[in-house]
C-alpha cells in the first residue's frame, strides 16, 4: 500500500503531473500521469493506492500516451485504421493498448475508413489524375476493405476517367512528337496503364488521339529518325544498308510504305 504525498505540475507540460508516494519509508517519486488519468482515477494527496490500483493507473497512462501519439499523427492528415496501428507498432506499443486506442479513435470519429476512402479517391482523381486501378491498390495497401473501396470508386465515373486520361495524353504527347504515331501510342498506352486506367478507357482515349495526329507530324518523326539512322548506317552498301534502315525504322513504329518512301527520297538525293 502506498499513500500519495504530493502532486506537482511538470515544468515542461502543464497537462502532466508528477506523483510522489510514501510506501512507509518516506516520500519518493512514484510516477507521472496525464491530467486525464489524474482525473479519471481521482488522484489526490492522501489517497491510498494498492498494487492492483497502481497497475491500472500505469496501464491507463500508457493507453493515454499512445492515444495522444495517435492524435498527433492524425493532426497532419487523415489516416486509416491500419495506418494508425502500424504507426503505434513502430512506437513499440503493445497490441492490447493499440486495440484500446483504435477503439477510442473510432468512437471519437477521428478515424473512419469509409470517409477516408471517399476523400482519398476524390483527391487522387481530381488533383493527381490517377486511374481507379492505382487508387484501389493504394487503398488496399492502407488496409481499406474491398467493399469500402468499391463504394468510394463510385465517386469516380467513367466520364471523369476519360477526361483525366485525355488530359494526361495531351500533356505527355508533346514529348513524343519525334516518335512514330504507333510508337507514340504505345508509350501513351504504357503511361495510362501505369496511372491505373482500364483497357476500355485507354482505347477510347487513344482512338480520339488518332484523329488528331496529322501527316505532317508523322513525316517529321520519320525524317528525324530516318536521318539519324542514315548517318549511322551510311557506311554500309546496298542491301545491308537498306536492311538495317528498314529494321531500325520498323522498330520505331513506321510502316513499310513510309520507310520505302523515305529510302526512295534518300536514293534520289544521292
From Swiss-Prot:
Gene3D superfamilies given in the database record: Winged helix-like DNA-binding domain superfamily/Winged helix DNA-binding domain
One CC-aspect GO term: cytoplasm
Coiled-coil residue windows: none
Pfam families, alphabetized: RecX_HTH1 (PF21982), RecX_HTH2 (PF02631), RecX_HTH3 (PF21981)
Transmembrane segments: none
Biological process according to GO: regulation of DNA repair
Keywords: Cytoplasm
Annotated disulfide bonds: none
Location in the cell: Cytoplasm
Assigned protein family: Belongs to the RecX family.
Family matches, as HAMAP family: RecX
Annotated protein name in UniProt: Regulatory protein RecX
Amino acid at each position: 500500500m502506498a499513500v500519495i504525498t504530493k502532486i506537482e505540475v511538470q515544468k515542461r507540460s502543464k497537462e502532466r503531473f508528477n506523483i510522489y508516494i510514501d510506501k512507509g519509508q518516506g516520500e519518493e517519486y512514484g510516477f507521472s500521469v496525464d491530467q486525464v488519468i489524474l482525473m479519471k482515477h481521482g488522484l489526490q494527496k492522501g489517497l491510498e493506492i494498492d498494487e492492483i490500483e497502481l497497475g491500472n493507473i500505469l496501464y491507463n497512462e500508457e493507453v493515454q500516451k499512445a492515444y495522444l501519439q495517435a492524435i498527433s499523427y492524425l493532426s497532419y492528415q487523415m489516416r486509416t485504421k491500419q495506418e494508425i496501428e502500424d504507426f503505434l507498432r513502430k512506437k513499440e506499443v503493445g497490441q492490447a493498448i493499440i486495440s484500446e486506442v483504435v477503439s477510442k479513435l473510432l468512437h471519437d470519429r477521428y478515424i473512419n475508413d469509409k470517409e477516408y476512402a471517399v476523400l482519398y479517391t476524390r483527391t487522387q482523381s481530381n488533383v493527381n489524375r490517377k486511374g481507379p486501378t492505382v487508387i484501389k491498390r493504394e487503398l488496399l495497401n492502407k488496409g481499406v476493405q474491398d467493399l469500402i473501396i468499391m463504394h468510394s470508386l463510385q465517386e469516380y465515373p467513367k466520364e471523369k476517367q476519360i477526361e483525366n486520361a485525355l488530359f494526361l495524353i495531351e500533356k505527355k504527347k508533346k514529348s513524343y512528337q519525334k516518335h512514330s504515331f504507333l510508337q507514340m501510342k504505345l508509350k501513351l498506352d504504357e503511361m495510362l496503364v501505369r496511372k491505373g486506367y482500364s483497357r476500355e478507357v485507354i482505347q477510347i482515349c487513344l482512338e480520339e488521339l488518332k484523329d488528331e495526329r496529322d501527316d505532317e507530324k508523322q513525316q517529321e518523326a520519320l525524317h528525324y529518325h530516318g536521318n539519324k539512322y542514315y548517318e549511322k548506317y551510311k557506311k554500309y552498301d546496298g542491301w545491308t544498308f537498306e536492311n538495317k534502315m528498314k529494321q531500325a525504322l520498323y522498330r520505331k513504329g513506321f510502316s513499310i510504305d513510309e520507310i520505302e518512301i523515305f529510302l526512295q527520297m534518300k536514293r534520289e538525293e544521292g
